Amino acid sequence: MTSALVDRPGSLPATSPARAALTAALTIAVLAAIALAAAWYAQLVLGMVPCPLCLEQRYAYYAAAPLGLILAFAAWRGAPRGILIAGLVVLTALALGNAGLGAYHAGVEWKFWAGPTDCSGPIVDFSKAGGLLAQLDSVKVVRCDEVQGRFLGLSFAGYNVLLSLLLAAIAGWGIARTSRR
């Protein structure tokens, strides 16, 4: 029986800095894909329509999943340490930026501050706008300041903050391990 840490022919050495980059990048790619799958499941199967801020929070995952796969492949193929670290820094920045956006959205949901006017401002009276009124009857506006559901006290925005911070920590671990000489 062989251990996962035992070096095998054709594999990265267990102590290789590239192995840490590969592990971090692949973990981030998988978690980003799971987050997107959960968001799309909630939208398509459970009927939870995302607000504009919810959609914006997906962008980081759309970028992190393929970037993580590319970076993992680069680590597996023996890319230079500087490229691996740069890729992990980009993944860290994506995750931290998304955590900030998620915290902002959670604050909007909890009414700590006002959200963007396109999804949480006052409802504008379009009764004098002619045909626009007829169109509004068929369109449901999803507001950013209304939570569609909470689980253990957190909304999707709250869970996004936690997941994004986890991804940043994983990328940070990858940077620290890859930087070792």
Where on the chain are the PLM-derived regions?
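Loop-to-helix transition at the N-terminal end of transmembrane alpha-helices
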Residues: 48-63
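Extracytosolic (periplasmic/ER-lumenal) interhelical loops and adjacent juxtamembrane/interface segments
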Residues: 110-155
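Short, Lys/Arg-rich, polar N-terminal cytosolic tail immediately upstream
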Residues: 1-21
